[in-house]
Amino acid sequence: MPHRAASPAMSENEFDITNALFQNDGDSDNEVPVTKSKPQRKAAPQELDFLGGNVDDDDEDDEAFIAEQQTSANRKAANLKGRTVKKGGGFQAMGLNANLLKAITRKGFSVPTPIQRKTIPVIMDDRDVVGMARTGSGKTAAFVIPMIEKLKSHSSKFGARGLILSPSRELALQTLKVVKELGKGTDLKSVLLVGGDSLEEQFGMMAGNPDIVIATPGRFLHLKVEMNLDLSSIRYVVFDEADRLFEMGFAAQLTEILHGLPTTRQTLLFSATLPKSLVEFARAGLQEPTLIRLDTESKISPDLQNAFFSVKSADKEGALLYILHEVIKMPTGPTEVAQRLQEEKANSKDSKNSKKRKRSEMDKAVNMKESPTKHSTIVFAATKHHVDYLYSLLREAGFAVSYAYGSLDQTARKIQVNNFRTGLSNILVVTDVAARGIDIPILANVINYDFPSQPKIFVHRVGRTARAGRKGWSYSLVRDADAPYLLDLQLFLGRRLVLGREHGDQVDYAEDVVVGGFPRDSLAQNCEWVTRVLDDNRDIFSQRTVATKGEKLYMRTRNAASLESAKRSKSVVGSDHWTTIHPLFSDAETEMEIQREKMLARIGGYRPQETIFEVNNRRSGKPENEEALHTIKRVRSTLDSKKKRAQAEEQSELLEDASGGNEGEANGNPDAMSDDDIPDGVPDNMSMASESDLEVTFSSYSQSKSDKAKKDSTAAFQNPEYFMSYTPSSTNLAEDRAYGVHTGTNANFTQASRSVTMDLQLDEGARGFAEPRTMKRWDKRHKKYVSRQNDEDGSKGEHLVRGESGAKIAASFRSGKFDAWKKSKRLGRLPRVGEAEDTSLSAGLNSAMGGKRFRHHKDQAPKRADPLRDDFYKKKKKNEAAKERQMSRAGGAAAGGKSEIKNTDDIRLARKLKQKRREKNARPSRKK
């Protein structure tokens, strides 16, 4: 029987099913016309042989027919052109329903991004996932698409089924927008719970039985505690920007929320980096998670060239300006895009166009999809104070600069990053925390103004350049205190360390770690300009003072380098090649500078043969103090003898090393002389002896007696059958140094996350997750020092209570507002999880939920009527009506008015007072 052809056909090329989805849809954006294919010849029906007389013949015919059909289908798909051909691994191959595919096409997604292609199939298999992806990589759709596919439609049973936690209000709004757009073909209800909105409105949302809850951790925990929510119905949980969640201090809230979730949930965690605290959280809250990380982000590109410059602390600003001016050739003044925008603005002022027309002209001048220019450079600084200082200094130098750091307002940060992406600025000064989620598609240069404290942070920084086959450069400023970290990086990368010009100009910047200094004259000119600016501009000088204080705190809190690198760095920094001019500078002026440095080194290394006492006596000709001269000569002779002995010992060690090297060459050098290369005049007894002759003649001596005895004593108690070493038997140093995730299927999350864990230093000196807080403050009320924990965990000094998980939460979360809201709405018990929902309840409480648009119901005080406007009396009447509505809504008497309708308590009180008056009036008079 011949080999059966593969079925179904290989998904090398797939047909576009968009036309099938949009057959009766007039809003389709598919411009490819539908062409009718020619009818294919169908095989004649085969006669069925129930007795099994010719089963083999039928099987062979079926196999031949299937193979022919597959071959023709593949041939036709290969000949198709345009948008009708989809590569394998598209959204159609993921098993999504037709409504969701239709929404994806309307959204504009044609091909899944790499993180979507890797993540969605794993999520569809009901596995917990830890995904590492930057902002802009499509990670929002990577977890929203499987969530909509799993939830499918609105459930008639009470209880939310999907939960998405975001660190900020803006990100939550963005996620809600994506959920609304991708869930258009379904009746799923989604709500947004963020701080700043009305609690009463959010009570109504949660009582309306939503399917998907998108919230910030603080507000969601507040509602959970206030409403006593049961989260046992949650099936799908997403922690979006998880590293940002921990940095913003939501660790306690996340722990409390996680404690209330069911164990059968599916948990997804997306982050740009993977700090140690996040790894511990994932191990505790996720069940056998799968780590998904793009391989291109885990290693340095082979097209990236690195240059390291040794510099003093006082010359760092001048060195930065020298790199921008002389190395990168950064132009000053406005960029080309900015000039184009100014021209478009000038043209729009001259022409009488509408506002819409002006906006279109500005969009033409600034193309949002335009990639950064060849001069685009990111400068990494240690703290936000350094960012402010460098931004002001570079602006003073005439460069077009943008900046970003962690505590910058979200809107301002977006504006600054967009200016850099569109080419309005050439330089972006950022911290590691702020740059974590920034995705720049094409970048030319990276400058490490402050050297990173971990090798993985260096890889994370320089990984933004040299992408898609393009060349890129990274320039790093290394002080003497940063030398241990440089050596750690050199060992981590496994590359050769080249100091100065010790190897000449034969260096490879892509494969070597090349360290050198700057030309002194050019560097001095830039340093003098910086000094002059600091003297003239007091604002920049004050910013530098603040940055210096912030640097002291940063130096105390950054990770320590390895002990071996710290020891080795002393000899590296003390060598003459540490400050030699970098091989990157190879012009005529540089050569003159090199010769001058050599001359200064010779002068600095000069040691006279006589002391000053001997020189003075020789000049005068009359020895004044012969005893002192004899003492000096005797000391010199002693020192000379010691020096000669030291030189002799050093020479002997060199000879021993040389002899050992010769033995190694004799054993392993393929270029060594063999027996066949011996000349004819040399006797045969000079040829190499065999191993058996050497064993018989000489005793093997490989180690000292003490080492041998130690080894024997160690092996004496080791039983190879039961002995278990503390080191793994299959240790591979090359694999330990690898950048990417360990090979395999990443089934072991602990092992897979070990190579990608990276802690970023916070840019404000704030403490991270699980770091102890020792600072205290004086409590005036209790007359004692108390911890600042209560001031910074969201409670603002209020009383704390223990939650269900044992974590501290603010006591204000249990304020009774939900009970008061239910009483005002005249509601009884809400349905429990699993019970049938009350449709009238959800429709009456929140009309905005589940609609096409999300509406905020926020009460604002009316603006005061302006007497100078024509509509003064109209506005005044409207304001008075609004005040009356507010007074009646507030409860009448509480707002200053009297309520005309009495409730049961008022009636009962009035009856009691009336009865007292009757009893009082019915008493007999005291008069006799």
Curated annotation (Swiss-Prot):
Q: Where is this protein localized, as stated in its record?
A: Nucleus, Nucleolus
Which GO terms fall under molecular function for this chain's record?
Answer: ATP binding; ATP hydrolysis activity; RNA binding; RNA helicase activity
Where on this chain is DEAD box (motif)? 240-243
Might you report a single GO cellular component term?
cytosol
Record-linked Pfam families: DBP10CT (PF08147), DEAD (PF00270), Helicase_C (PF00271)
Q: Where is the composition biased (Basic and acidic residues)?
A: 342-353, 621-630, 789-802, 859-887, 899-909
Principal location: nucleus
**Annotated ATP binding sites:** A133, R134, T135, G136, S137, G138, K139, T140
- Which spans are transmembrane here? none
Q: What is this protein called?
A: ATP-dependent RNA helicase dbp10
Q: Which organism is it from?
A: Aspergillus terreus (strain NIH 2624 / FGSC A1156)
Q: What is the lineage of its organism?
A: Eukaryota, Fungi, Dikarya, Ascomycota, Pezizomycotina
Gene name of this polypeptide: dbp10
